[in-house]
Structure formats: structure tokens, C-alpha cells
Amino acid sequence: MKHLVFFAALALTSVTPAASAQENLPNQAEAPENILIFEPGFFAAAVPSSALDMVIRIPGFSVSDGASVRGFAGAAGNILINGARPASKADSGTSVLSRTPASRVERIELIRGGAPGIDMQGQSVVVNVILRSEISRQQTVTAQATIFEGGPALPSGSYGFSSSNNGTQWGLELRRIVPTNTSTGVGKSTRRDASGAIIFKEQRRHDFDGGGWRTRGNWSGPVGLGRLEITGGYWLMRYEDELLFSAPGSPERLFTLKNEPSRADLGLRYERALGRTLNLETRLIQAYGWDDFTSRSLGPGFNQQFETDRTAGESIARAVLRWERSEALTWEGGGELAYNFMDTEQSFISNGMPVVLPLASTRVEEVRGEVFGQASWSQSERLRLEAGLRLEHSTIQQSGDASSKRNFFYPKPRLALTFDLHENRQMRLRLERELGQLNFGDFAASSSLPNDQLLGGNLNLRPQQRWISEAVFEQRFDRDGVMTLTLRHDEISDVIDVIPLDGGLTAIGNIGDGTLTRIAANLRLPLRNLGLEQGRLTLNTQYDRSRVTDPTTGDRRAISRVRPFTTSINFEHDVPNRNLRWGLSYLPWSRDPTFTPDQQRTVERRHDVTLFAEYTFENGLAAYISFTKWDDLRLDRDVYSDRMTQVIAFREEQRIDPRDFVQIRLRRTF
């Protein structure tokens, strides 16, 4: 099954229609066929304000900032700026591009399958944003308001400054940030017994509020024989949440949540040439985080409070040496050393009495080292091969309420093949072993009071491993049209899900081996043949089938939090002679299942629609307005009276009409 994807994808090449002419693509200059060049004129009709406005409009590309994991290698996204990723993990590619004025972009390269001097970091497709180096100074001011039906009204905005002077750049940003919550609003909750008889009905009201600040500064320029990049940032947030259930003649049930997280980071990146074909890149990253979390529940017969005080930190040192042996062959090798820690103090009080939780007080530390090597070979202009191996060793030590020390070693090979079948037709194949990183929060206790659930900590967590076989077929047409079909199969070891503990508790843990099979289709269709010269329709569909053995019942089921089906429809139309762009997005349906020993929960969304328009005045002021209607949210819960037999104690159905909201934004660059 692991390699079936490869053969199925190869069969597609015999049934796909011929590609359109190469001259319909963006200006290619002297670029290889696997690198598409997009110059500023390609985006002119949309009047972009930032580099991010340009990148999100590239046909056949979906922005990813990478995974939120420890270390740098597994967290890399698919955005590069001048051939490199940002100096700090916390400063994502989209964040950098959002504060980079569009006028500074010289060109954007869409790299499919690899290119000399480009660190793909396991990505099949990346964009490389090339910035102009001439003297410039720009300031950007943004004012925004997000107004929810029935409240709250959340103001936000930002001020950014950037300067470039013959290779030296610096900038700063101050931003007001606000949270969002897709489940707030009014609705109804109905609880039934196993026979379907109604136990009680309640009205449901969910409110939230909050806000925070984020600041960041950056500098880059020549130092010694190389180039140094420095970035640092800090942000803090306040978030409050209130969920109320009420019914005439019955006591209310109230659940509140308050979280005050903050983060600080500093990143340094230094790159220098050691010769005409040899290049060295080094990185140092330091990050800290603090969380103060309180959750309360109050109702008939219960008064509970769960508190968490958490401090975490990460230190990373990384070096990469690249040797361009020839135009066809590039070697790369290096290493990464990371230290992570997390201190957690938690308490749970129920009806005035402290409740002992497994691993409520704990400190987790990890020392992780990785060495890696990779070779990229272009057999011809149409065939490219990438082969690599990463060797990871880590030691995780836990102290506090319980102690443990464990060592892990995992080899992570990767093989990727890119084949240009025709000028506009490409096949990408990948076989790779990926190692998931453990969430330090899973080592400590946690709670979900509205779902009547307490999770104990787990000393014995192991990283989840995947053997991934993937094939992507890409067909480009009509200048900016593109269709991609993805077939993927994962063989998963040590699946991480929820396991039963003694005393009626549960915890995050490993539940054995599993599989995931994915079929995804994406289409970007230009609408010029329908009379909309700058119109386009984008369709994205993904089907996932996951299977694993339930640790409680022994039955086969899906893996928690894997959506079986997702789809989206987006329409955009640029009207350059009126300095206007408008469009809409539609999400028809999504479903998130969660399986635990004591209950099964599903979150289902239906018919989410966003309509937007943006007008750019002659003086450069851009005015944006959008209306979002979240039509239907369903929260269903089956609670069992017995774990082993999973006899239904009651079923809970929550039907919510989430609050619609309007966003208004003014942005001026000068």
C-alpha cells in the first residue's frame, strides 16, 4: 500500500490533456522549467499593498508557515525571502511579508521540486521573494475594527517602518492584536437519554473578549565577510471566555475561562560564502513563553476551578554547509542542537476540596541533536532528484510529581523526485519518514470543564512516526490556471490520541499503529473566457481516511481530530480600471471527531460565507470591508456510562448560530 500512490500517479500522465503553450506562463527569463517567475506586473491589477498580498495570489501555491514544533528543521514553512527563511521561528514568513511593502518586491520565484542554493526543508514547493536593494524608506499605518453581531467590537491596528540602503535593511512594527472565536453566539442545548427521551433543554450563550500587543524589530546587513540578520519580538495577550447554559425554572450552568499568554524571542542568522561554490549558514534562536490559565465551572451540585501556571523556553543552534558541486549537483550537510524546557504548576479544586491529578506539578526538559545530509541532482532540465538523511537523538527528562528519563533515536530518510512531463505538466513524488514532536503540555494534567473531562499527565509518551508516500500531479494552463491532484498514504506508528487511566481519568498517549490515506484536488480556473478578464475561481477538496484501533474497545475507528472531508470555494475579481477588487469564499462543510474512553465528540460546521471588497484611492489609501456569516455550528457529544461497553448514558446536541461579523480596515503606505 505504501508505494501504491506512486503507480497510481504515474498512470495519470497518460490521460491528461496536452498543456498550453509556454508563452502563456509568467515571464520566465532564463529560469528552469521547474521555477516560475512572477514579476510585479503580474499582480498589478490587484493593487497589492504588501508582499504577502502578492504571494497569496500565486497560482498553485498555498501559504504554510510550518508546524508549531520544537527545533527549527520541523518548523520551516514554504516562504523564503532572498533565498532564506526568517531568522526566528516566531517571525513567520507571512508575518515578514505582511510588513514588507509590495513596492520592494523585485520578483517572486515559485520553485517546484528544488533549485541550486535553495533549502527546501522537506517542502515540495516554496516561493522565494526577491527584494530590491536600492535606497528606500516606507511607513505603513493600518486601522482595523472587527465588529461581531451582539458584541464585542474589537479595534486593532499597526504601525510599521522599514528602511533599505544598499544592502542594509532595518524595520520595526507595533501592532494591536485581537482574538477570534468561531463558536460564540446563541443557541440551544438538548440532552437525551439512550432511548432518545429528552432529559432537559437549555439556552446556550457564548461570549468572549480580549486583546493584546505585539512588537518586533529587525536589522540585516553586511558584517565581516558575510551577512547578518537579527530579529526580536515580544507579544502579550488577554483572552476571556464565558459559556452560559440556562432554562426557565432551573439553575444556570456557567463556565468561564481566562488566559494571559506572553512570548519573547530573539533570532540571529549569519551567512557567508567560503568560496565560489561553498556557503555556510548559521542560526541562533532563543525563545521564552509564559501562560497563566484559569478555568471555572459553577452549577447545581458543582463548583470547580482549574489553574495552570506555565513557563517554557527554547534554545537552538544550527549550522548548514552547502556545496554547489555543479549546476546539476548540490550537496548539503549540517547539524542542529536544541534545548527545551517547560515548568508547569496546576491545581484543581472541586466543591472546595483539592483533587489530586497525575503530574499536576512537573518540569520537562529535552536535549535534542540532529545531523543531516542531502544531495540534489538535476539529471536534466526535466528530471530532478533529492535524497537526504537526518539522524535525530533526544533525551527527555521529567521531574516533579514523578520522574523519568528516556532516550530516543530515529533515522529520517527522504527521497523526492520531480519530473517535468511537459512544459506545463509536472509530477512530484515523495517517500519520507517524518517524526512528530511531543507536545510538552501532554506531559502535564489538563482539563475541559464544559465537556466534563480531566486529563492526567503521561510519563510514557513516545513521538509519533510516519512513513509518507505521496504523489502530486500538476497541470498549468491558460497563463494563470492550474490543477493539482495529490495522492498520499501514511503508515503511522505510535499514534497519539487519548488513552484510559485508572480512577476514571484519561490522558494523551500512544494507542498503536494507524494509517491515513488522502486524496486532494485543487483547481484555479481563470474566468476570462466568461468575460471576467481578471476573475478566477479556486476550488479545493481533500478527503482523508484514517484508521486506528481504539485502546478501550479494540474496535477500528478514525484518528481523533482528522477531518474526513474538507472543501472550499473562492471567487475573486480584480477591476483595475476602478482600483477595485472583490470576491467571496464559501466553506460548505467540515467535521472534527474526537474519541476518548468516556465520550465521543464531534464539531461540525456548515455554510460559512465571507464577502469582501477593497478599494484603493489615488493617494494610496486602501479601504477594505468584509462580511462573514457563520451559518451553522453543531457540537454533539455521546457520553458513556461504561468505558468497555460504551453504553450511552446521555447524548448532548448543541445547535449554535455563531455571531456574524464585519471587518473594516484602512491601510496607507507612505
Where are these regions (language model features)?
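C-terminal beta-signal and adjacent terminal beta-strands/loops
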Residues: 615-670
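N-terminal periplasmic accessory domains that precede
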Residues: 51-54, 93-97, 122-143, 157
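Extracytoplasmic beta-strand/coil segments of soluble accessory domains associated
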Residues: 25-29, 36-37, 52-89, 113
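Short acidic/polar hinge/loop motifs at secondary-structure boundaries
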Residues: 85-112, 217
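Surface-exposed extracellular loop regions of Gram-negative outer-membrane beta-barrel proteins
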Residues: 290, 341-344, 348-349, 395, ...
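Gram-negative outer-membrane beta-barrel transporters
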Residues: 488-491, 509-596
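Face-selective signature of the C-terminal outer-membrane beta-barrel domain
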Residues: 214-237, 257-404, 420, 485, ...
